[in-house]
Amino acid sequence: MASITNPAYKALIVDNAGTKYGFEKTQTSLDISQPEKEIAQKVQFMVPNITVSGKKLKDIISVKNRLYVYYDIGSGWKEKFRGYVWTKNTNESDDRTFRIVGYDRAIYLQNSKDSFYFAKGKKTKTILNTIANKWGFKIVFNYSQITHPKTVLRSQAISDSIIEILEEVKKKTGKKYVVYFEKDVLYINTVGTNTTIYSVKKRENALKISTEETMEGMVTKVVIRGSANDNGKTPVVATVKGNTSTYGTLQDEISKDKDTSVANAKKEANEILKEKGKPFKTRSVTAIDNPVIKKGDKVNIQTDDLSGSFIVLSINHDAYQNIMDLEVE
């Protein structure tokens, strides 16, 4: 029987005619991943190339077919993934199986470019809803918002525009966010706000822990520049230093427009130093799979090397092997 430590998974593909093809315990692999640097969730698995009504399955299933993944932990089937077949790989030398790669709706935002202009004074949620309405998706917004200056988003991926807006909020508030699609709705949440906090513990479900510490991406000094003068030069109006004596100078620059005070610009600079002013530690965790855990969740880890609460940066569920790989901070 399915349980939280022995979950069951099944995939479902709906072809162009509306016929449903279910795969439970028949696929030879099934991975569901949420990478750190992308908002699109990815699914990949091998499909048995069985014969259905005289046709091979590889000739029935095509790209853009609807793709769903469900899990059961003992309380019935729940949806884990909703998206599309994006890639189909077949191999003439081995016709027994073929490979499916699917993505949720965010893949369209990552592969489509657009331009937007927003006048000064627009709130974060207003900007994001404008983008969402134009592209036909809904947003559930559970994150902080600010009043933005004039914003020009020119010829870039829709997902990059969304992230650019949210990065401005993070710089000014210091709060981290997570973005993901669930049932075709885009969720924007503050990280670590999940109501159920699952644990990874030694001798229970933890399998392997490793830690990486790096200075890559650090900032120890922030230069604040004002608006350009008639010669195109941008004057330095302030400099905020972090721990340059220990780590050396790793400099970032931010711009202060005429509507932003130096005090507020310094506040933004201090938020950058708070987030990036010391070496980054990333912990990689391999544990028995828990399909409920997703990117942005808070998890409790208790092992010899780690103890406390951590935020999930990325996660891969290997349903076939019943393990999950997480990167946490």
Model-derived features: where do they sit?
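Extracytoplasmic
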Residues: 8, 27, 38-42, 80, ...
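Amphipathic, non-transmembrane alpha-helical segments in extracytoplasmic/periplasmic proteins
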Residues: 44-45, 102, 115-140, 153-180, ...
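Flexible glycine-/small-residue-rich
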Residues: 47, 102-104, 190-192, 226, ...
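Short intrinsically disordered coil segments
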Residues: 59-63, 115-121, 201-208, 239-241, ...
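Short, conserved beta-turn/loop elements at beta-strand boundaries and strand-helix junctions
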Residues: 88-93, 315-321
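Short beta-strand-centered interaction patches in the first periplasmic/extracellular domains
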Residues: 95-109, 141-216
